């Protein structure tokens, strides 16, 4: 897992985002077991309390479920991945549009730029 964290967002949320991206890319699937808190802390080089907070937040959001004595698993709800994809897409687009507006681009210029970029131009 990439552990270069930004200072602008709490680390536990950045780790959750990394897991969300893995879910959307289908690197993790509903029912998959996540590493234990200790294992994830070692992988990400953060305090186990940070990982516990990450897992608790994801459980609060319904993304994971903790099974006593077994560990933490991706929730087996089919709609989770679609909801996450929509949420992450919206966040990326909001950031993109905000930055483009700060540069003074119009909606048409943004769309033309996207078209040119995606067509390899």
From Swiss-Prot:
Residues 37-56 bind DNA. Residues 9-77 form the HTH gntR-type domain. One of its GO terms (molecular function) is DNA binding. Keywords: DNA-binding, Transcription, Transcription regulation. InterPro entries: Tscrpt_reg_HTH_GntR, WH-like_DNA-bd_sf, WH_DNA-bd_sf. SMART domains: HTH_GNTR. Disulfide bonds: none annotated. It holds the Pfam family GntR. It comes from the Bacteria. This is Uncharacterized HTH-type transcriptional regulator YhcF. It comes from Bacillus subtilis (strain 168).
